[in-house]
């Protein structure tokens, strides 16, 4: 597999500004992610003393998996005080978007580079956001159908949308297998298809909860790298979090004030507010089989779906004795994660790192230092066919990744058309505009006639526009094969107006290039970069 790095002219300059150590952006974080001294400082930080307990919890969480030697070693390293690089993601259907895998590769790559540079073992940890309850965000994925040259949405259907956390959700296995079958119907059959289908079927048969199936697929893919997994909703982990839940409840108003102040500061720097929340407690409580947002009305802590209320002593007692009923929101999850782990760096997507920029004062309030916040690696897969099509139409890859192919497609259509025809129609439009101006001069001062002339002009312009559009549409139809090829480039490299990794599913890559495509023996070694990586399988 070949690998190259390209620099894109990105519309969103947040990550390029991190790369260039822009003082406005780096000032939002504790550390400058582009400076080696930041890593030296984090690597030398004292540990928090929770590493041995965390190692036991992670071992228990992964006990239903057959651990690799690399994972066994990393659990031992963690227990002995090794620091971590961490990142997480929601448990998406069949692995979710490709960027989930790329986030894990980011964690692996940075962990290895830090281990090699500092001669200290750094452990890669992936945090599964099983506490989330927005099932609509994880119950679907997309698959590219080569025969149709288009993407198709594949969704796991439920009679009722679950309101509990995804870790507490147990999908119907027959329905899930039908969803899997639908996905494979759209994918082309390759020599890898049957083996991949068997792996997925086995995971569905062997595991019951939504997040356990997600974990098993990730484990199957990344165990050889030594990645450790933990679910935010895992009960033994929640028990470790009890002291922090109590602190959050006691300081909830100060926490909310700190968050709002930091968010306002980011807006003053010209950034849009990323975190949208009405709560002033920033925790959820599981009650009546629903994940319910907690807020404080000045006297009571109140749940948003059942209107159940608690006085402070009651809710703190729940945090102490039943911490598994609590879960974090977007504000407190990063805080809890860093309180638990001895983290060198947190790896996040473009939106995630903007969330973290709104939390600096929250970390300081709880005397927890924000780690280095690193943008994850961004990766696109370029197969031989798409590369040949780019060459055929002389389209720069970097341009497609940023803008898509619509501009190049329109240019191609006009090149196939009669230039004289287009020029004459456009000339008639310009002539009509001049005529309209002359006629308006003739009827100046008479509003009825002005309206009549303008309406007549509008009709003529519409007719010429229609003539030109229909003519170009006919050219499109005459070049149907080329139009399909442009669509193929678009759906592969810039699907739904964004990067491939945000839409495509990992199963598509596994099916096309083999079930070992992401394994160390096949996948190219990566170097950490803020630029874009192109991989040719």
Curated annotation (Swiss-Prot):
InterPro entries, sorted: Bacillithiol_biosynth_BshC, CC_BshC, Rossmann-like_BshC
The answer to whether the entry has keyword Coiled coil is yes
**Disulfide-bond pairs as recorded:** none
Coiled-coil regions listed: 422-450
Q: What's the stated role of this polypeptide?
A: Involved in bacillithiol (BSH) biosynthesis. May catalyze the last step of the pathway, the addition of cysteine to glucosamine malate (GlcN-Mal) to generate BSH.
- The EC number(s) given in the record are 6.-.-.-
Name of the protein: Putative cysteine ligase BshC
- What does the organism's lineage look like at the top? Bacteria, Bacillati, Bacillota, Bacilli, Bacillales
Q: Could you say which protein family the record assigns here?
A: Belongs to the BshC family.
Alphabetically list the UniProt keywords. Coiled coil, Ligase
Main EC class the enzyme belongs to: ligase
Q: GO terms for molecular function, please?
A: ligase activity
